[in-house]
């Protein structure tokens, strides 16, 4: 069954947890699509895990379109949400709608995600009015890393906690079909989740959200130097890759790869003829 924005909204009333992962390429998307996963986020996190940037701020619309196209080719039943990158929507409502349209029309995304609370609700409403589904994103919003002074947990005092609750309500009122809650205390995420009728997708926001999302490289243990506290590792793919790469290099240098089983044959009479 194909996952849609309606699937997401209905899941909250059915009390069925939603599961999302990031993906940035065809191969990963194809594997995720074959699993029991509801949605794929083509996140601007690709700037860090694919392109090697220190944060997400350098990611462009062209980057997002390129990677989203690849994911769309690989995933047929999973809902695909694509991030609007930094400065693609902050400048004006027009830019927000235009760039959201590019992610749908050019890249094939089903929905878009943008960061921010009350200040971006006019963008959310305009994009939804253009018939493009929107996922909100509040809490630790990575595009605000410089304003926050780093990747810091949000909502830990009374005023900020109340602000996040109000932001969630305003995002719902603007027409979003879901909200990502990132880097906020578990009990606050529970209050937010119970305060709105659209599903919350948590990342570092505890177990009470309506669903969860992780960066797939993090949960597979691909990078030993990138390990946020909220990430549980379900594999050690980084170590497995190193072992495989080193085994390959060793066999090439020893002359044991490729062996007969991995080589093509030719009739000896042909060899004899061409070497006369």
Swiss-Prot record:
Q: Where in the cell is it found?
A: Cytoplasm
Q: Which domain of life is it from?
A: Bacteria
Q: Does the keyword Transmembrane helix apply?
A: no
Keyword Magnesium annotated? yes
List ligand-binding residues for Mg(2+): 44, 83, 115
Q: Where does this protein hold 3-methyl-2-oxobutanoate? A: 44-45, 83, 113
Report the co-factor binding details. Binds 1 Mg(2+) ion per subunit.
What Enzyme Commission number(s) apply to this enzyme? Answer: 2.1.2.11
Where are the catalytic residues?
182
This protein's pathway reads:
Cofactor biosynthesis; (R)-pantothenate biosynthesis; (R)-pantoate from 3-methyl-2-oxobutanoate: step 1/2
Instruction: Give the UniProt keywords, A-Z.
Output: Cytoplasm, Magnesium, Metal-binding, Pantothenate biosynthesis, Transferase
Please name the top-level EC class of this enzyme: transferase
Any idea which GO molecular function terms this record carries?
3-methyl-2-oxobutanoate hydroxymethyltransferase activity; magnesium ion binding
Known cofactor(s)? Mg(2+)
State the GO CC annotations. cytoplasm
Any Pfam family matching the protein: Pantoate_transf
* Reactions the enzyme catalyzes: 3-methyl-2-oxobutanoate + (6R)-5,10-methylene-5,6,7,8-tetrahydrofolate + H2O = 2-dehydropantoate + (6S)-5,6,7,8-tetrahydrofolate
Concerning NCBIfam families, the annotation shows: panB, PRK00311.1
Q: Which PANTHER family match?
A: 3-METHYL-2-OXOBUTANOATE HYDROXYMETHYLTRANSFERASE
Outline what the protein does: Catalyzes the reversible reaction in which hydroxymethyl group from 5,10-methylenetetrahydrofolate is transferred onto alpha-ketoisovalerate to form ketopantoate.
Question: What quaternary structure, including any partners, is listed in this protein's UniProt entry?
Answer: Homodecamer; pentamer of dimers.
Q: What is this protein called?
A: 3-methyl-2-oxobutanoate hydroxymethyltransferase
Q: Which organism is it from?
A: Clostridium acetobutylicum (strain ATCC 824 / DSM 792 / JCM 1419 / IAM 19013 / LMG 5710 / NBRC 13948 / NRRL B-527 / VKM B-1787 / 2291 / W)
């Amino acid at each position: 069954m194909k996952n849609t924005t309606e699937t997401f909204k209905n899941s909250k009333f059915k009390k069925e947890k939603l599961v999302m992962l990031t993906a940035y390429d065809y191969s990963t998307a194809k594997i995720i699509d074959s699993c029991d996963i509801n949605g794929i986020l083509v996140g601007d996190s690709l700037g860090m895990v694919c392109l090697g940037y220190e944060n997400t701020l350098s990611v462009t619309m062209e980057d997002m379109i390129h990677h989203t196209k690849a994911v769309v080719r690989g995933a047929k039943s999973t809902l695909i949400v694509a991030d609007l990158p930094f400065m693609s929507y902050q400048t004006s409502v027009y830019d927000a709608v235009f760039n959201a349209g590019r992610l749908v029309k050019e890249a094939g995304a089903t929905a878009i995600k943008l960061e921010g609370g009350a200040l971006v609700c006019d963008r959310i409403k305009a994009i939804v009015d253009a018939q493009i589904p929107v996922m909100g994103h509040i809490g630790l919003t990575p595009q605000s890393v410089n304003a926050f002074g780093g990747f810091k947990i949000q909502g830990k005092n009374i005023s900020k906690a109340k602000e996040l609750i109000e932001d969630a309500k305003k995002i719902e009122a603007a027409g979003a079909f879901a909200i990502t809650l990132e880097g906020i205390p578990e009990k606050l995420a529970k209050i937010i989740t119970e305060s709105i009728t659209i599903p919350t997708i948590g990342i570092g926001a505890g177990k009470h959200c309506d669903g969860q999302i992780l960066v797939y490289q993090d949960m597979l243990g691909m990078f030993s130097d990138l390990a946020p506290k909220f990430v549980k590792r379900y594999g050690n793919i980084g170590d497995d890759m190193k072992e495989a790469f080193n085994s390959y290099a060793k066999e090439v240098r020893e002359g044991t790869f490729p062996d007969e089983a991995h080589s093509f044959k030719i009739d000896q009479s042909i060899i004899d003829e061409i070497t006369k």
